[in-house]
């Protein structure tokens, strides 16, 4: 058969196979056109599940008489005009295929009136010959598109339609998804001339929650955690369910990018990673997530349905979602989400948000740890090493801490320890946090019974950076000592080229790495790392691994606890050196870190005084008033 150009009718019907899958596909395309036209009210009237009639009416900008015929032509659109426009698409539609594809498999009537046009006009097209007839009509400002007898000229496609009830359920779900993305727009859905749903435009937060409840259920709204976060040009907000609100189906999972309904594998993977070990088998999280980014950072021209997107910085987006949702779930006390069957600990302690549940048996196989959840009202940006309130076994923590302090007392710590007067620090449980200094230090006021011996000052300055490093060392050592591994999978495995000596070292110390949360394999001359400890999740793993192996190559294979502790010190110090900048602590995270320090270290604080605390010289402040 010779090569030939397809007839317009045949080409449009082929395109319709991609664009028009079922009646819900038609409704989606028509509503997106209405939204792009600036409509504030959209009415959707369905008959017989959409097989008989689909009518979408809006009060948008409308189409002038001269462009009605062009509007039904293939590859005709007002939304893009140049190739560069594809790099920054802001409209929902842009292909110019929808109306032509729909009219090729139905009897379509397009009626429209712009505000500056006195008369409304109507375009009529049928799938048989694709000829468009223009005639005057009566219509208010806006557009009405009526699609009759869908697939009337393609019997095979019509036979594949499901029952009327099933097809309408798909349309109903579509309207729900779109209504959650545009709270400022009124949607009215009718089926067989009866109003099924009416979502009125919302102006206040309470009205938004009312629409959210009508779509996602009252139970979701009552237990959902609201969050919002931003990182440069990337913003994320929405609602997520806590652990107790897990559902038996994934029917409440909505995600939007720049107002577009999407089902993206990258985002699904990020959300699953957050909830992976927080939910029981067969349970699903519920969420409504809104992501906003620069249009040139996301490619929506991936699939005709436009449900799939491609991010230019996929790793950044993935990790931003994971960190934001993890902090959200960890912001509230675990008591709001612990199963009732579990015994309640007698005391509260603070643990890093990345810590997992305590284990009594020793297991070397790394696995991701549980995430705590609870009710929060708002989330702000927090350091990557944020801390959250947790309930733990205080006896177990004290036992770990005592053993850890005994080993670390003789270790060569990476902290500066300027010579100053020797003194002893008593219990700081009732000390008062005064303020945060330069987002790096915490000013603490002691009461009369908590003074430093031989030092006449009621104030201390705490180095948050040093406390953070010290606690990370404790976390690593605890993971090694009792098999409580904190491992997180990398989005993409990291490949590191190593020489023969370092490859041999990685084999010799494989058990140590596993107990600390590393998972890797050797492939030729490369080490392929798939999981790392939680504290290395955002670190440059490819730079850190060779340094760790170089350190281990100079030690004995049979490492005792003292040597393992020194390795943990070296690992944390290396991590600090590889960080581009210091953490900017917030008052909330700094206070949580201080409380964590007290709960874990208790009477051992005097052993760490030179590394953690400094006594401010108040005489310098006094001299400032003397004008000398």
Swiss-Prot record:
Residues 333-344 have a biased composition (Polar residues). Keywords: DNA damage, DNA repair. One of its GO terms (molecular function) is mismatched DNA binding. GO terms for biological process: mismatch repair. GO terms for cellular component: mismatch repair complex. Residues 355-371 have a biased composition (Basic and acidic residues). Residues 333-390 are annotated as: Disordered. The keyword Lyase does not apply. It comes from the Bacteria. This protein is involved in the repair of mismatches in DNA. It is required for dam-dependent methyl-directed DNA mismatch repair. May act as a 'molecular matchmaker', a protein that promotes the formation of a stable complex between two or more DNA-binding proteins in an ATP-dependent manner without itself being part of a final effector complex. Belongs to the DNA mismatch repair MutL/HexB family. This is DNA mismatch repair protein MutL.
